């Protein structure tokens, strides 16, 4: 989770949304990413999508042995990618500021662990308070 938090902090420094993610195969990080929708003027570069992209093409067998760590509960798009690639476990930093598709993931057999990390909660709460319009755009509310 520490590496995912570092990615989220990088996103904030770049003027973006503080959501970070890492894809871990066995014990090695193979992909790191953070939400770069603002920085890249992208509609899809959420933290999890960026981590998957930065992992590069992998055989399906690799994804089936991975854990994806994300600082915030994954949205429908990111959850869909997790399901598509057969990632069996998701560790979520927090789901108090946004609860994504955890039930969908669980219904497909994905092990979902929510740790309610105080740094993740604080980072998102501060961002949402300071940037409500950007946040609502990111989650598809406006």
Regions found by a protein language model. Give the residues of each.
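Zinc-dependent deaminase
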Residues: 1-11, 80-142
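Stable alpha-helical structural segments in soluble proteins, enriched in small hydrophobic residues
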Residues: 4, 8-11, 47, 51-55
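Short loop/turn motifs at secondary-structure junctions
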Residues: 17, 62-64, 86
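Short beta-strand scaffold segments in enzyme catalytic cores
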Residues: 19-27
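A short, polar/charged loop-to-alpha-helix boundary motif
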Residues: 36-50
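Local cysteine-cluster metal-coordination motifs and their immediate loop/turn environment
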Residues: 45, 68-88
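Mobile, glycine- and charge-enriched loop segments
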Residues: 48-72
């Amino acid at each position: 989770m520490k590496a995912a938090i570092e990615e989220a902090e990088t996103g904030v420094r770049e003027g973006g949304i503080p959501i970070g993610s890492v894809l871990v195969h066995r014990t090695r990080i193979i992909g790191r990413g953070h939400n770069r929708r603002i920085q890249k003027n992208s509609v899809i570069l959420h933290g999890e999508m960026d981590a998957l992209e930065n992992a590069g093409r992998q055989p399906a067998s690799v994804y089936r042995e991975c854990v994806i760590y994300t600082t915030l509960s994954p949205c429908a798009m990111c959850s869909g990618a997790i399901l598509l690639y057969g990632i069996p476990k998701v560790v979520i930093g927090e789901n108090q500021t946004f609860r994504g598709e955890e039930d969908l993931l669980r219904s497909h057999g994905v092990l979902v662990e929510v740790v309610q990390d105080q740094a993740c909660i604080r980072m998102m709460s501060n961002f949402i308070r300071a940037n409500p319009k950007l946040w609502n755009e990111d989650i598809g509310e406006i």
